[in-house]
Amino acid sequence: MNEDMMTEAERASIAADGTDGLLGKRGKGVFHIHTLGCQMNVHDSERIAGVLEANGYVPATEDQINDNDLDLLVLNTCAVRENAAERMYGTIGRFNRVKLVRPNLQIAVGGCMAQLDRKKIADTAPWVSAVFGTKNIEDLPKLLDQNRATGKAQVQVTEQLRQFPSQLPAARASRISSWVAISVGCNNTCTFCIVPTTRGKEKDRRPGDILDEIRQCVADGAKEVTLLGQNVNSFGYGIGDRYAFSKLLRACGTIDGLERVRFTSPHPAAFTDDVIAAMAETPNIMHQLHFPLQSGSDRILRAMRRSYRSAKFLDILGRIRAAMPDAQISTDIIVGFPGETEEDFQQTMDVVRQARFSSAFTFIYSPRPGTPAAAMEQIPRDVVQDRFDRLVALQEQITEENLATFEGRDVEVMITGKLGKKDTDTHRVTGREKTGVLVHIGVPEGEPVPEIGDFVTATVTHAGRHNLLADPDVAAGQTYSVRH
């Protein structure tokens, strides 16, 4: 896609596209994948890329993307927010402008919106070549062949999972960090959520298969894995083993070469002491936790069908921090859920003050078609926006105060990249410390410059609003060291 047709997110997504020795050869076609939404979609896009490469397609270079020198554009969509359809059709429209320049370009649409609006997509956007659901990644090459042969849009969306996406080939976006899905789908019935409709009921992978995949990731160069699931800590409940997730975490601790393990997302109702103990006692399990609150009002939590209340939520946080005082805990909060009063909102603000999250993903409630909450009486937008702004201001204050506590401390950072156009002059690198905080590091003059995947221990010299800076003065006794 041309630069002037791309959003900032699209430009950033270029960096996630895999490249290999096939570049310069068109193979069956040069492709680019644009991903919207959550980490599971990022994981699925790696599988889409893997399936395409296994069938003779070649990932595009940055120059090919910028020059529209493409044979296939794939859009992996999200359905979580109300504007998901607008974003999808807007992106499909931009893809069509590329097709006007390259008439033979094929356009494929997958992901959660494809699962929901399969027929509408084909009817509304006749230039789309293929529509495939979340359970049909492996069908994409066949659909493209059929479209090429017939000239007609091909639609393949099934409700039953035939095989885990993780069993498909993968073209991983990162050499050092890997996504590993432990389950797909969700058994919860939150009244605001569309995920059970688009992803289906929860199905767990076999622990042995998960561990085999992790070992392969490490053999391929990964230093870090993130375990993925809509509700990771209900892993194993289907076979009657409520300790399966904590056992899996401990098993990750036995894998040689695996430096860091994270997971997302757990459900507070199923977060048990055995998981806390496994996190605290397994050295390579990072003390980072995304713990969705959604609301601090018990009345609203009940309306959301969230099977916990604010007191239980805060009690679990207390147990986590007692076991791991350094834990960084982030959250999700929905503002303006139908029926939310100012009193309900103030209860959310109170919980946020007590919880002191490291960060929060705050969302204005978006009604999703077919969910129970969409049929409830909605709150005026101006009221919701005012509450949203107040919550964001409170959380930003807490985040800044939390980051300030890192100043003067030594942190170990896994290097994931370099900063800006001047990185070769400033030797400034970036990465995340153990609890997930983003750290930008200035390499002191005369000290070794780390490569991506190296670990740097450095003294934090300044806390920003959303990240940390480490510009250590080695001569003054501040720390800087590199571990390969």
From Swiss-Prot:
Its cofactor is [4Fe-4S] cluster. Residues 29-149 form the MTTase N-terminal domain. It comes from the Bacteria. GO terms for cellular component: cytosol. Binds 2 [4Fe-4S] clusters. One cluster is coordinated with 3 cysteines and an exchangeable S-adenosyl-L-methionine. One of its GO terms (molecular function) is N6-isopentenyladenosine methylthiotransferase activity. Keywords: 4Fe-4S, Cytoplasm, Iron, Iron-sulfur, Metal-binding, S-adenosyl-L-methionine, Transferase, tRNA processing. It catalyses: N(6)-dimethylallyladenosine(37) in tRNA + (sulfur carrier)-SH + AH2 + 2 S-adenosyl-L-methionine = 2-methylsulfanyl-N(6)-dimethylallyladenosine(37) in tRNA + (sulfur carrier)-H + 5'-deoxyadenosine + L-methionine + A + S-adenosyl-L-homocysteine + 2 H(+). [4Fe-4S] cluster 1 binds at residues 38, 78, 112. InterPro entries: Elp3/MiaA/NifB-like_rSAM, Methylthiotransferase, Methylthiotransferase_CS, Methylthiotransferase_N, Methylthiotransferase_N_sf, MiaB_methiolase, rSAM, rSAM_horseshoe. CDD domains: Radical_SAM. Residues 172-401 form the Radical SAM core domain. Transmembrane segments: none annotated. PROSITE patterns: MTTASE_N, MTTASE_RADICAL, RADICAL_SAM. [4Fe-4S] cluster 2 binds at residues 186, 190, 193. Its main location: cytoplasm. Residues 404-474 form the TRAM domain. It is found in: Cytoplasm. Its EC number is 2.8.4.3. Monomer. NCBIfam families: miaB-methiolase (TIGR01574), MiaB/RimO family radical SAM methylthiotransferase (TIGR00089). HAMAP family: tRNA_metthiotr_MiaB. Catalyzes the methylthiolation of N6-(dimethylallyl)adenosine (i(6)A), leading to the formation of 2-methylthio-N6-(dimethylallyl)adenosine (ms(2)i(6)A) at position 37 in tRNAs that read codons beginning with uridine. Belongs to the methylthiotransferase family. MiaB subfamily. This is tRNA-2-methylthio-N(6)-dimethylallyladenosine synthase. It comes from Bifidobacterium longum (strain DJO10A). The gene is miaB.
